[in-house]
UniProtKB/Swiss-Prot annotation:
Residues 1-83 are annotated as: Disordered. This is Twist-related protein. It holds the Pfam family HLH. The keyword Nucleus applies. Coiled coil: none annotated. It comes from the Eukaryota.
Length: 166
């Protein structure tokens, strides 16, 4: 058997003698979640875990990866994660520009999402109401300013604080 088949999140070269309990202990020390036993039997080839391991074992060959290869993979994973985080932050920045906010608002990501959801609900209410005529519903700058003002008033009246707790 190959050493790769029992890859642990702690060390890529753990021996096969590590039991699942030992792996769980190692994961709990690192703050990781326990793995679920998704397989019905260890021989089940349709298991997501065994498919992943088979793919990994076949791509690396019979020798364990060198330290340099592992370090290179880690660096690449860090680069991908940094790019993903940067992309996510840029998306939140764009969302914050779209949502009408008060000058004093410094919104966290979760607050931004909740406020965006409330703003969408508010816009749906505006569209469904007969209060606005067709001229005001156009996408002009004045209409946008009026909607922003109406949303700010709506927030200040307490509708935001009541609905944000959901």
């Amino acid at each position: 058997m190959m050493q790769e088949e029992s890859s642990s999140p702690v060390s890529p070269v753990d021996s096969l003698s590590n039991s699942e309990e030992e792996l769980d202990k190692q994961q709990s020390k690192r703050g990781c979640r326990k793995r679920r036993s998704a397989r019905k039997s260890p021989e089940d080839p349709d298991s997501p875990i065994s498919v992943k391991r088979n793919k990994k074992a076949s791509s690396t060959g019979s020798s364990p990866q060198s330290f340099e290869e592992l370090q290179s993979q880690r660096v690449m994973a860090n680069v991908r994660e940094r790019q993903r985080t940067q992309s996510l932050n840029e998306a939140f920045s764009s969302l914050r520009k779209i949502i009408p906010t008060l000058p004093s608002d410094k919104l966290s990501k979760i607050q931004t999402l909740k406020l965006a959801s409330r703003y969408i609900d508010f816009l749906c209410q505006v569209l469904q109401s007969d209060e606005l005529d067709s001229k005001m519903a156009s996408c002009s700058y004045v209409a946008h300013e009026r909607l922003s003002y109406a949303f700010s008033v709506w927030r200040m009246e307490g509708a935001w604080s009541m609905s944000a707790s959901h």
